[in-house]
């Protein structure tokens, strides 16, 4: 299974790094499961929302065809929602059979591409109304950490991507494997505030 984590200028760091940590821990910790994970972007270097510079493993031209796509949110998604090439790429990935997942405002790009039509979905709490405005057929779930609607999985804001990624491990392999990965990354949140 090939997992593509999408990067772009303005991508929210934890939106992609949280799922990356979960899914890469799975790939490296259990190599027999046959998971390959890589980053992909329009350009080799991107500057994320909080200023972090990251080098992508692949551009879209060199990336292997993914079985699963993680599309983060962040300020960069604002331009993506109106970019015909980005929206077509998303549709082509879906049409190619990839399981399409998003974190935070990545779901707004999916909505603009038509992926969320007549589906339940969620996004970052600050853009719930925008999700509903982009496509009134979406069954918006404002209180969900993530929503699995089969071919598309959307997560709420930022840290919810970690929960979604653990769900993906359970869905694609087993609950036991997801628990092993969760233990490995020592993810057992008890916020102090």
Q: Could you tell me what each predicted segment is?
A:
Residues 7, 123, 156:
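Small/polar loops that bind or transfer phosphate-bearing groups
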Residues 151-157:
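A short glycine-threonine-serine/GTX helix/turn-capping micro-motif
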Residues 100-101, 122, 141, 153:
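Structural detector of well-ordered beta-strand residues that form the stable sheet scaffold
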Residues 1-100, 107-112, 129-143, 162-193:
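Extended, subdomain-level signal for the structured scaffold at the beginning of enzyme domains
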């Amino acid at each position: 299974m090939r997992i593509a984590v999408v990067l772009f200028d303005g991508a929210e760091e934890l939106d992609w790094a949280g799922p990356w940590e979960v899914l890469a821990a799975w790939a490296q910790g259990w190599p027999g499961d046959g998971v390959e994970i890589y980053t992909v972007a329009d350009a080799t270097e991107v500057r994320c929302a909080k200023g972090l510079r990251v080098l992508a493993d692949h551009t879209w031209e060199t990336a292997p065809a993914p079985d699963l796509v993680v599309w983060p949110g962040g300020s960069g998604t604002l331009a993506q929602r109106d970019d015909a090439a980005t929206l077509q790429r998303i549709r082509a990935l879906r049409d190619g059979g990839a399981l399409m997942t998003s974190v935070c405002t990545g779901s707004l790009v999916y909505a603009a591409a038509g992926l969320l039509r007549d589906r339940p979905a969620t996004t970052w709490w600050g853009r719930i109304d925008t999700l509903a405005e982009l496509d009134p057929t979406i069954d918006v779930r404002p209180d969900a950490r993530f929503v699995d609607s089969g071919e598309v999985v959307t997560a709420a804001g930022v840290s919810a991507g970690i929960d979604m990624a653990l769900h993906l491990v359970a869905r694609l392999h087993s609950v036991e494997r997801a628990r092993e990965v969760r233990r490995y990354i020592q993810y057992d949140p008890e916020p102090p505030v």
